[in-house]
Amino acid sequence: SECLVGSEMCIRDRMEACVDGKLDAIDLQFEDNAAVCVVLASDGYPVAYEKGFEITGLEKFEGKEDYFCFHAGTKFNEAGKIVTNGGRVLGITATGADLKEARKKAYEATEWVNFANKYMRHDIGKAIDEA
């Protein structure tokens, strides 16, 4: 994606302003919401893990405005299927009115995606729920 979650401005425009030394001349605009990202990793990461497991459920992100799936350790296999190809496989991100809502939605979206050795932490943003 060329735009940042929570930003109303294209990341390319920000990068060009940085390169041109004109970051102070642009109006950085952000949405009034929160975002939480939960990484789906390969079990065993970072020490030892298997690759090549087919990833299913990615189509569930289509048409969902507040949900994002960022690919990291993925690739297409010979059959054209998306498979795992690294330790940090996907970044499942959701936005909400506040951090509690964003966290709830991000963890909800992690259940949409499946692959054989899927692993994730369950404590991302946990302090938010305890506050």
Stretches with model-predicted labels:
Residues S1-G6, C10-I11:
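Single conserved hydrophobic/aromatic residue that forms the stacking wall/gate
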Residues A17-A131:
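Peripheral (often C-terminal) accessory segments that flank ATP-dependent C-N-forming ligase machineries
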